[in-house]
Each structure stands twice: as structure tokens, then as C-alpha cells.
């Protein structure tokens, strides 16, 4: 941690550039995607669902405004909403299914004390209208004005802690209040608070499934948030509110925002000048008189391990009260991380989209270990390690496609950390298999497939092996045996069968590389199970019943949403055979027929790429599809369609993402695609090559420190086709490159043109 402080100080000094020079962090706009609007998206899933608040790269703390508590509002914030309830120290990014976190909600107020947010006209509350004119979101910084109170609120973060600066008006009854029960999508069911001294509090908030959250409790989220908070203004008149919540009252989702529930909280007992309190619904407040424009600060360390961990996190990272210093360090950290990829050319808006996308890929997987390496394990006990950083929020079904392949190039340590975290979780929890959607040690079981298996296979083949290989293999094998194309699985839907088949191919590859010859053919054979649900009469994949008969074919055919397909239709899901594209082509009647159908799939897609029945960039099942043209011998079609997707599906503004950010996946796809390279098959170190959005892209490989540069001469929105290429000065006629070639550094140079060169890359 001392190294972090020294590094941040050095970076802060180095980033003092002229006002005319923009750094990568200056291009970041955290408002991009910060909408949950189902109306704008045209589908219930909504848009990006990102949060606009302050964070550091892969940090534990995200300090952000919260506009609503209940409903399917994962980030806690939506740009369209008019009120802010407060500012929380933890958030999820880009997820649906009700979300979670949003803990330790801080709200500066004036006037009479209110203990509910004020969602119901019958019960006045502490929430406030806020000024859009004053709202600022930058990498590592957020600010707005709460207009009901005329309080200007600013916040910034270190990796495990955050600091807030409030500028108050003249008022004899100013206040900072903290709702300790608050939780996105539910509530904390039990809290503890201790007054340490006249300016410090510490405590915890338990968040079990009974309190809702992640999937309204179905995701089994069960964690405790610990805090250690200091105030710049000593306590004089302080206290707590303590609501009596009867047994049997639902504490999930919309229940905790109902008038019935808020009425219970509104009757809370006020406890003055206490030392310690524990209860089912607690909040803390400190009242004080302020002069006009008086500044009061609050800072807190957060931990998922202990109160001592929270204290250590705060005192290590933010020992003083210099808000601007913490802000400068946060920006410096972002500049260092974002500089792993540099771009030239393109418009200012395209640069903003690119660096914001790269920023969003660096929110998760977040650290959950304290500064000393202590973390909460899968056995609900504290553990300590210096071998890796415990990480969480593994949205596997999404992120194996682009997010982890991207990080394998620029941040291989993050990939290694996540694999270690999943393997240790399988070990400590006693579950013995790798979770597909992990959240703070919870086995959520969300989505389908065994996505941790391709993440491990992709890492291993790329030389990322800083974990217990045999444990990783064992738990990967257990995963495909528990959830896979196994004999006892009779009914066969499309999504699971195809996803499991790919995972089993990855397991076969791992068996080959890790010395398990007896498993190679077993899983290679199971990887071919996808052929069993191909209906030659319909010419497409079709789900089967448990007795082996076909499910009835719908009137809309392969366009029928959710017909054997998860968050997709068979037309979208059916392309997912990345491990055997030639085999898929054979089923379809040959390459020419497959290419024609695939091109038609794109031709019928709406230009804005919003949720639709064809190429649906708004959701993950199709994310590897554009790169299949390279594998089919028509690389100019990959060039054409990738450029169009990048131009039309990714924009500036709160509606800039056509679908949920999904913990970095939506943005990682863009970062790789706009850079001109993306895998068609994770687990195969081959990257497909195509035309980049920018004239120059320089990628620093995290494993070697060497820079791989892609240059596109004559590049423009019209000149999207590669005419010729050289690699390190020598002619290059392949439409792909190996991971090791990227790590070695070098220069790949294209000449671009307005018409396809159908001889290049064949």
C-alpha cells in the first residue's frame, strides 16, 4: 500500500500538464450509459445501467449518487430521475436482476430530521431534488447540488475508502445523516454502530438474502459491510434513529419502499448521545450549525472483512483531510490504467466513447480484500494472502466473451486474481465447482453455462498461470460434470446445450494442456452435443423435450424470443458454436449458405442496434458472431459490420449504450473491436483482425511491457476495408494474429480503402 501512495503521488505530479493537453482520464464521461430507461431501450432490460460516481481502477469503493432504492435498478442511479436519496460507498455497474450494494448511504441535510427517504407524499423525507446544471461526473470525482438544502456535494475515492466534501448554507440546523439499513433492491436486516470518539463512528451492516438485493434474494447474496468513518466537524448533537421492524415483515425489493414499510420506519425511536447500538433498522445523524459556504467533510474506509479492516483501509489511504489530494491521486490512477491503450485519429466523441468504455472495463472485477490482503472467504471466515488480490463480481456468462480476453492483454494480473478467487471460493465454500455468476462469495446460479471454464482455458493458453493449476482443473472438471451435456440431462434447450458444448471443448483443451489425456476425448466428444439439437427439417437448432422429441415449432420460427433460448431467440443463440465453426457450416449446408444467412442476419438488423430479433448488440449471445466471417473466408464482412456496430451502437450521452453494461462486457467488446482485434473463440489464442475505428492504436501488453501498434492509413468512415497489411515492415496477408505476437510488441500497418479487397486475409 505504501507503493500505491508513492506511485499515486508520482503520477499526480506527472499529470500536471498544460490546460490544452487532454489526458485519457479527461475523455472519460461516467454519464455514458447511466440510464435505466426501459422506454428508451425499447425493452424491459433497459440501457447501460452504469453509475456516474467516483471510483478507482478495480477498487473496492464506488462513491455514487443514489436516486432510488427499490425495483430493478442495479446501479442505484438513473439520470432520468429527479431526486437523490443520498450517496453510497458501494455500487454495482451495469447489471439487471434488482442489483445490490448501495450501502452506507450518506445524505447532507438541513432543517427537521427525517428518517425515511420521502418516496410517499404522506411521509416527508430526506431525499432532495438536485441540480443537473451543477452535476459533474469525471474519472474519480462526482459533484452536484442538493437544491432542497442548497448543499453542494462532492466526492472522490481511494481504492478502499472515500471522502466527501459538503458546502453548506448558513443554517442553525445543518446535518449529515447516514442510513445504515439502506441497500439497493432491498435492505440490510441488522446493523451495529459504535461512537468511537467525538468525530468517529464504526460499525457494520448485514445483508443476507432475506433482505432482498441481488435477484431479490434469489441470488443468495450474503455479506456484511464494515465501515470506519470520520467527520471533520466534532459531534455535539448526535444520535440515531432505531425502527422496530416486526417479525414476518417482508424486507425485499418493493416491500421496503412501500408506504407500509416506510410508515414503520417513520415511527423510529430517536436515541441521543449513545455509545453503541444494534438493531434491525438504524441510522446515524450529527447536527451542527453552519456559516454560509462552510465546508464539512466525511471520510470512511469500507471493508467486507472487519471494522478493523475498514479502519486500516481509511488510515492507510486517506490519513488527512486534503480532498483535492485524494482527487488528484484518483485521476492519476485512472490516467495510468487508461494509458495501457493509446489512440490517435477519430473524432473527439469517438475518443470519449473509447476511453469511457475502457474506464467501464476497469470497475470490475473489484478488490474485496483489505489493504493488508485480508478478505472474507467462501467459508464466511477471514483469510489473508499476499499471493493474489481477492476479487468479486464475476458476471461469467457475459465477461468470458470480451472482458477477460481484453484484460488478458493489458491486465493479466486481474485475470489471475479472478481465477484464484473463484478457485479458492470453490475450495473454501465446500461447493467444489466454479460459480458462473459470483457476487461477494455467493453462488448465484445466474444465467447458463460454465463460463469460468473458458476464462481459465483462455488464460492458460496465453501463459497466465499464477494459480493452483491442478485445483483449477479439478474444479473446472467438477463444473462441467455438475452442469453440462451429461447423460442424465434429458431435456435439451438451445442456450444450455450450445454453451455447455463450448465449455466442454475448453475443458478438453485444458485436459490436453494440463496432462489429463483420459479427459481429452471425453470432453471433445461432448463438445459435439450441439449437433443433437439441429433439426435438418427446419434447418436450425431446436429444443428437445426430456423424451427426446422436439418442442413444438413456433409460428415465428427461429425468431421466437425465449424459445429454448436465454434472453435471445434461436436465430441469435444458434450461431454460438465458436469451437467448431466448420462443423456448424456443414450442418447449414456449407460455407456459402452459412455466409449468406449470416450476412442476412446483419442486413435485417436496425441501424441503431437497439434490442431486436437479429444481430442484438444489446445482449451477449451474439457478441462473437461478427468475427465468424473471418473464419469463413470473408474477412471484408467482419470489417464492414464491426465498423458499423462501433459507429452506431456506441454513443456519447446517458443513452450511449444500447444494452446493460454487464460488468464491463459491453464496453470491452467496443474497446477490442474499435482497436481492430477480437477473439472469435476464447480458449484459442487467435485474435481476428479487422479495420480499427482509429488511425492508430497502441496497446501495452501487461505481461511484457511491450507495445503492439496498429496503424490504419487512409482510414475514414468510408474507407473501412483493408487493402493490404504489413507486420513489422513485412507483407502480412493473414486476417488473424496470435496472442504471443501481441505480447512481443511490433507494428501492424494497414492501407485502407472504400471497397473490399477480397484477396486479402483469405
Where in this protein do the model-derived segments appear?
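Bacterial Sec-dependent N-terminal signal peptides
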Residues: 1-21
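ATP-dependent phospho-/nucleotidyl transfer catalytic cores
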Residues: 503
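Conserved catalytic core of nucleotide polymerization and phosphodiester-bond processing enzymes
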Residues: 712
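Extracellular attachment/recognition segments
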Residues: 721
